[in-house]
């Protein structure tokens, strides 16, 4: 058993750590509210630009690469969105596992995979394992800024438009030397963490480019006449100015850029939620550990007092016996 002094020193140390984890928990809680508000604020713009792009795509004859399904894709880029700091439980490990699954699938399809990483933890993770990172950006995982994420968003779009046979211009954060042309790619995938609730964050992986076409089934209300030629309402056509092709060509990069930034906002909220959960668990564990150590310390103190009393009583008895013998 450890000495009483050692136990008291350890209790003091655990209490100090508990103060840190509690402070981190409170900070993460306040950041979650802000991050959620940013996600909610971005939704109206996301919904509107999605609706406009869908309308334009339906009315356009534009044969844009962003809209074309790949036929002979040979090179795929993956953007891994991780955190800049730790102490957030399994948040980053879940992202890395999801990335490994996606990478394995793409390689099985015969595609060369290029890694782009956002966040210091992801950069450290892949550098430690000797993985080749084509581009790395950090410093904004908890509070993404549209200007700060410009280079990563623009490079993914430019690299895709260039294709695996072409090159894109150099941007800040790329591994290539400044001014050197960078090889493009045929697909862009993103791995991030979707915020579901304070207690649930789910790693997601989906293809950003080319845009996956989603066909929605037409919904009919109960009692609607589906047989006769009678029509109660007519959907009006839209007149676009300038023409749909020009508008779509201008909006598609903005649409993709918005998707990347939205994923970063979701990841920021998920990171704070994961850190709050981890720090809350650490604080609870510290409280339990202090209770256990205090119990052991009290037992040690009680044993020490008992030993002292026994020694005093024994000494008094010895003195009494020696006095009687005199």
From Swiss-Prot:
InterPro entries associated with the record: ATP_synth_F1_ATPase_gsu (IPR035968), ATP_synth_F1_gsu (IPR000131), ATP_synth_F1_gsu_CS (IPR023632)
Bilayer topology: Peripheral membrane protein
Keywords tagged on the record: ATP synthesis, Cell membrane, CF(1), Hydrogen ion transport, Ion transport, Membrane, Transport
Top-rank lineage group of the source organism: Bacteria
Keyword check for Cell membrane: yes
Pfam families referenced in this protein's UniProt entry, alphabetically: ATP-synt
Record lineage: Bacteria, Bacillati, Actinomycetota, Actinomycetes, Mycobacteriales
Protein name: ATP synthase gamma chain
This protein's GO CC annotations: plasma membrane; proton-transporting ATP synthase complex
CDD domains referenced in this protein's UniProt entry, alphabetically: F1-ATPase_gamma
Keyword Nucleotide-binding: no
GO molecular function, one term: ATP binding
Species for this entry: Corynebacterium jeikeium (strain K411)
HAMAP family (alphabetical): ATP_synth_gamma_bact
Subcellular location: Cell membrane
Subunit structure: F-type ATPases have 2 components, CF(1) - the catalytic core - and CF(0) - the membrane proton channel. CF(1) has five subunits: alpha(3), beta(3), gamma(1), delta(1), epsilon(1). CF(0) has three main subunits: a, b and c.
Protein role: Produces ATP from ADP in the presence of a proton gradient across the membrane. The gamma chain is believed to be important in regulating ATPase activity and the flow of protons through the CF(0) complex.
Protein family membership: Belongs to the ATPase gamma chain family.
